[in-house]
């Protein structure tokens, strides 16, 4: 069986799809990946990858869309626009590579197309070549809502996206509520990389891992300055992953590191502080560590509020990060207990390898 996996040309959209793609391959199926941009700059486990969006520049697309919709842009930057802006944003993005995905599907003749909710070019391709399409969640919004928003956008309105043969849901029900579909565990995948020896085990003191988004953009605020200012009064070691280029002199309990596979680092951390991307949230939950999520544009406020509502972490604006907040993050037993409960909930969900047989049965 040949499977085509399609994502928007962004690393954070592609990486969550890799574990299922690898499970397909390990089960003896042929897997092709269609994406672009920085999504193809990371280790995809040896999967055959096709660049369907050469020269893709998300920043330029976002700038044009937000300029056309200034009132919605203001709500989007505050994380209050729901799916209104994301539909136009990713509709415009998909329009730049949908023809290439369709051409690839016609040439390679997959038996099934798996696509993420904001990579609906995959759904168009499945419809055009007459094979089942499967939507795989890679964030905390309902997949159907996102697909509908992108499909209804001006740039994608002329393309028909058929109803998916199945929807794979990865959000733990205690976080977002139960959802119809085929449940699957969100298995973190960071795209390879080396882990320094000092991060391969727990330290003598609590450890806070701090990471930044792989997508540059306005809004939300960078918490780095507040973290560095608070650090001397925090009884923990703080690790800044891929920090901004210029930093002041760091306190003794703050270290920096380049890109590391967070799925191999977080299990030894006490807490995780990040920008609120869905991959970061699900990775932190899978590791069972409390999170401090900085609300921001797009889905980041939604994600931060979901984590805080579940009790598995805190939602704190960048400029409101203080020693008291960081000390609570590593000492509040209720946060740690809730984070472990969600970890156990996710661990009980079916693995990607468990859902492959059910998806294989969809072949026409």
Spell out what each predicted region is.
Residues 1-123, 129-131, 232, 239, ...:
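Glycosyltransferase specificity loop/lid
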Residues 34-40, 145, 150-218, 241-246:
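A nucleotide-sugar donor-handling region in carbohydrate enzymes
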Residues 22, 185-271, 281:
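Donor-nucleotide binding loops and adjacent catalytic segments primarily
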Residues 51, 135, 167-170, 183-185, ...:
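Structural signal for conserved beta-strand scaffold positions within catalytic alpha/beta enzyme cores
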Residues 128-142:
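Active-site proximal beta-strand in glycosyltransferases
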Residues 5, 135-137, 209-212:
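Short beta-strands and strand-loop turn motifs
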Residues 132-136, 181-187, 225-226, 289-292:
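A short, gly/pro- and small-residue-rich
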Residues 77-84, 140-154, 306:
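Acceptor-binding helix/loop patch of EC 2.4 sugar-transfer enzymes
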